Regions:
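Terminal connector regions
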Residues: 98-127
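Short, acidic/polar linear motifs in exposed loop/turn regions
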Residues: 54-57, 96, 112
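Short, hydrophobic beta-strand segments
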Residues: 88-96
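Surface-exposed binding patches on compact interaction domains or structured appendages
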Residues: 56-87
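Hydrophobic core residues within well-ordered beta-strands of beta-rich domains
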Residues: 45-47, 86, 102, 117
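Buried hydrophobic-core signal for structured, non-transmembrane domains
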Residues: 47-53, 90, 104-109
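Beta-sheet-dominated interaction scaffolds and their linkers
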Residues: 21-48, 54, 125-129
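Bacterial Sec-dependent N-terminal signal peptides
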Residues: 1-23
Length: 129
């Protein structure tokens, strides 16, 4: 009787593990964007990072935080279903900043298997003449 009970419990445990959904998983097309060289006369530049939910559960972006107040990320707020795409638009505002090379990071936190991903933007703002 005990053997039947143990076998039944193992069967149910095995079925529940097999039926469990795999978590969401974010996959970006690229992790870095280089703006190249731009003048401080036009100090605001933007780019978009595209991603896909390659997992089997809905993906939610909980937070996207820039390393500096001069960089602003805007992201998809609704859950991204498996196989669907989303985007994070990043704007760098160099107004009042010293000309030269910059590199900033955007930390993206999700409900995915990998909870944190770091994106980077860089470029060189030249002095206005």
């Amino acid at each position: 009787m005990k053997k039947i009970l143990v076998l039944t419990m193992l069967l149910f445990c095995g079925m529940s593990v097999a039926m469990a959904q795999k978590p969401a998983e974010i996959k970006f097309d690229k992790l870095t964007h280089d703006f190249g060289t731009f003048s401080e006369k036009a100090p605001v530049v933007s780019c978009t990072f595209y991603f896909t939910n390659v997992g089997e559960s809905p993906l939610v972006i909980n937070q996207a935080v820039a390393s500096c107040g001069c960089t602003v990320p805007e992201y998809t707020k609704t859950p991204i279903q498996p196989g669907e795409k989303g985007e994070i638009k990043v704007t760098y505002n160099g107004t009042g900043k010293f000309p030269g090379h910059f590199k900033k990071s955007i930390t993206v936190r999700t409900n995915g298997a990998v909870e944190m991903t770091r994106l980077y933007i860089e470029g060189e703002m030249t002095e206005a003449k």
